[in-house]
Regions:
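NAD(P)H-binding glycine-rich loop region in Rossmannoid oxidoreductase-like domains
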Residues: 49, 53-104
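NAD(P)-dependent short-chain dehydrogenase/reductase
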Residues: 140, 172-226, 232-234
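Active-site Tyr-X1-5-Lys
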Residues: 153-182
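Mid/C-terminal beta-alpha module of Rossmann-like enzyme folds, strongest
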Residues: 238-305, 335, 340-379
């Protein structure tokens, strides 16, 4: 039985990851701010497994992660670290973002270093994001990310900048200390392929809300652009596949479909508008002009942060390493487009009724993009 130390375990990706890890022969140590709150989250979903789930109170922003002496001793027996912690908040301030991502990376690396020197860390898995500019070749640069990072990486948005600098820092430290590192770069994450339920509304949800209000009359960038997506259950399965591997050094996995096979932004908005019974935008606006509009007050009207447009991209990404693990047809088989209308409907509802609560007594399932709520029982 291997011991996994997981950050972000109560988050949108983390809860799904715990569900997948539960199928393995593991003991999971979850870093949480509040043990009682975390237990309640998993109890409500019927997924609390006390036999192999252990909640450890701490904080990414604190030295030694704020662990008690007893908890630190337990964590030092870890075989694999999965670092998926940090909020999805593109509007975070520089101070907030640096505290969570940069300081968090520093503190968890100190832990990884101690484990590796004590017993040998089998693997460090870091979940970052597909827009990170760093990979296995260009990350071999000797800069102090805390002192020189902001000047080196000229990205205005603090959330993106600090998250990517944290990626660079962990890569630097893994190389220096010698622990195996897997960096997983998912695109924008939506809900499970089984339900479409997307609790994380800060990403795609902002686009859905803008369209619902009739504030997205144009196609940002045009047909050459796209918004890559992945479901949280398929992402979790991929992370577990990487967890099973013996990782010798440092490997990056970018989970973005080949551009020629992916939906472009015009097609995505068309499906979205049809799902919401809204008129689809027809006119394309060049991305530089679109960003200028957003920076000049358009963000206040559409409620989409100007920096949110950076996730709509015309870039091509290398996904060879991901295909090597999952097979050449993995992206096609797991395409979000198969259930995208259900994701849009879920986000539309959540954005309109933000105080609503999901009753976890009912099991939610999809059938041909129709959502069913079932109550388990005997009849």
């Amino acid at each position: 039985m291997r011991t996994v130390f997981l950050t972000g375990g109560t988050g949108f990706i983390g809860k799904q990851l715990v569900k997948e890890l539960a199928k393995e022969d593991v003991k999971i140590l979850l870093l949480v701010r509040s043990k009682s709150k975390a237990i309640r989250i998993f109890q409500e979903r019927g997924s609390l497994k006390k036999a192999f789930m252990h909640f450890i109170e701490g904080d990414l922003t604190k030295i030694d992660l704020g662990l008690s002496a007893e908890d630190k001793e337990r964590v030092l027996k870890t075989d694999v670290i999965i670092h998926a912690g940090g909020p999805m908040d593109i509007q975070a301030t520089s101070k907030e973002a640096a505290s969570v991502f940069l300081n968090g990376a520093k503190h968890i690396n100190e832990l990884a270093k101690s484990i590796h020197q004590l017993k040998g860390l089998q693997q460090f898995i870091h979940v970052v994001g597909y827009m990170s500019p760093f990979d296995d070749t260009n990350s071999k640069i000797a800069i102090d990310v805390f002192q020189e990072g902001n000047n080196y990486l000229k990205i205005k948005n603090p959330y993106e900048r600090t998250k990517f600098l944290a990626d660079l820092y962990i890569r630097q430290q893994a190389s220096a200390v010698g622990y195996p590192l897997s960096v997983i770069n998912p695109p924008t994450v939506v809900g499970s392929s089984k339900t479409g339920s997307t609790e994380q509304i800060a990403g795609l949800g902002l686009l859905v809300m803008s369209m619902r209000r009739g504030l997205m009359p144009v196609i940002p960038g045009g047909k050459g652009y796209r918004l890559p997506l992945i479901s949280n259950d398929e992402l979790a399965k991929f992370i577990v596949q990487v967890f099973r591997l013996e990782q010798p050094t440092i490997q990056t996995y970018t989970l973005v479909e080949d551009k020629q096979h992916d939906q472009n932004i015009a097609e995505l908005l068309s499906i979205m508008s049809e799902s919401m019974n809204m008129r689809a935008p027809k006119i394309s606006v060049p991305m530089p002009f679109m960003k200028a509009i957003m920076n000049s007050g358009g963000s206040k009207i559409t409620k989409i942060p100007s920096d949110g447009l950076t996730f709509i991209t015309k870039q091509k990404f290398s996904n060879v390493s991901a295909k090597k693990i999952m097979g050449g047809d993995w992206f096609k088989k797991t395409s979000v487009m198969k259930f995208f209308p259900a994701v849009v409907a879920d986000l539309d509802y959540r954005m309109m009724y933000q105080n609503g609560r999901h009753n976890h007594l009912f099991k939610r399932t999809l059938c041909d993009n129709t959502t069913f709520y079932q109550l388990q029982g005997k009849g």
